[in-house]
Amino acid sequence: MPECWDGEHDIETPYGLLHVVIRGSPKGNRPAILTYHDVGLNHKLCFNTFFNFEDMQEITKHFVVCHVDAPGQQVGASQFPQGYQFPSMEQLAAMLPSVVQHFGFKYVIGIGVGAGAYVLAKFALIFPDLVEGLVLMNIDPNGKGWIDWAATKLSGLTSTLPDTVLSHLFSQEELVNNTELVQSYRQQISNVVNQANLQLFWNMYNSRRDLDINRPGTVPNAKTLRCPVMLVVGDNAPAEEGVVECNSKLDPTTTTFLKMADSGGLPQVTQPGKLTEAFKYFLQGMGYIAHLKDRRLSGGAVPSASMTRLARSRTASLTSASSVDGSRPQPCAHSDSSEGMGQVNHTMEVSC
C-alpha cells in the first residue's frame, strides 16, 4: 500500500460503497487496526478523542489505522434515495473483506463500539482468518425480539431520533444530568449525521439477529470467536448486561473483560487514558509493541494494579512467537469439537 493512500477513500463492495479513512502506512507484516463506530456516530464522533490521545498515538505509530464509516453515516454523506435498502448487519460485515483486499491488509485488529462491535464480531465469525484480535466495546450479542421491537417503535413515536439514539449511547445517569458531553453529542448527532440515513442504520441495527455464539465446551460444536478478545463496558452503561452475556459466550482463555468505572456509555471518549493502557497490554499480550515506552513511566508513574493484572493475563493466555519484529503471532488454539465439555474456565475480569 503506497503512503499516498493516507486519507479518504470510497471502496466498492458487494453491497455498495464504503467510506474509509486511512491513517499512517503499513508497518511490515503487522495487522492494520480497523475501527467501526456505533449507530448514531461516525468514525470521527466515535473515535477521534481516543485516537488523538497522546499515548494512543504512540501505539498507532506502529500500525496503519483504517477507520470504516457505515454506509451513509460519514460527514457530508448524501441522503440515500427513496426505497434504498440498507445492508443487513450480516451484509455490513461481508463488506469488510473488500476493504481488507483493496488495501492489501493480511489481517486486522478490530476496534468496534456498539453496532460496530457487532459488525466486527460477525466479520470475525465469517472470516476468522482475516482477524487477529478484537476490542469490542458495548457489544450486545442478542437479537431483538418482538417486545424489544415494539419498545423501539414506541420510543420512536414519543422521542426524536437523536434522543432515541442518545439513550442507546449514554447511561441513564448521564442523560438525567444532561452532561456537557450528552449536550454536545445531541447537537452533533442532529447536525453532522444525515438523519434519514441514520434512521435506516438504526432500524437495521434493531432488526439484528443473535450472534449465535457459545462458549467452547458448553455445547457440541460450539461456534465462537477464535481470536483474542477484549470486552469493554462502562459501569451502568446501557450495554452492560449485553457485554456480560457476551463474555459468558466467549472462550475464557482468550478473553479479557474490562469494566470501567466512571466512564459512562462511551469509555473511549470519557476515559481514553485507561482504555489506551488496556489496549497497549492487549497488544503486548499478542506479541506486538513489546518494547513500547510508556510516556508516563519516565515521570515515575507506574501502571495501575488492574492494568498490570490485565498484562499478566494477556501474556499468560496468549502465546506469540516472533511478532515483535512484524511476523504474525501463532493463532490461539481452538477446537470446535465437544472435547472438554464440562470444563470450568474463568475469563480474566478487570475493573478500573
From Swiss-Prot:
Its main location: cytoplasm. Predominantly expressed in the brain (at protein level). Detected in neurons of various parts of brain, including the olfactory bulb, olfactory tuberculum, cerebral cortex, striatum, hippocampus, dentate gyrus, thalamus, hypothalamus, mesencephalon, cerebellum, pons and medulla oblongata. Residues 301-352 are annotated as: Disordered. It is found in: Cytoplasm, Cytosol. Keywords: Cytoplasm, Phosphoprotein. Disruption phenotype: Mutant mice have impaired spatial learning and memory but normal motor function. One of its GO terms (cellular component) is cytoplasm. Belongs to the NDRG family. This is Protein NDRG4. It comes from Mus musculus (Mouse). The lineage of its organism: Eukaryota, Metazoa, Chordata, Craniata, Vertebrata. The gene is Ndrg4.
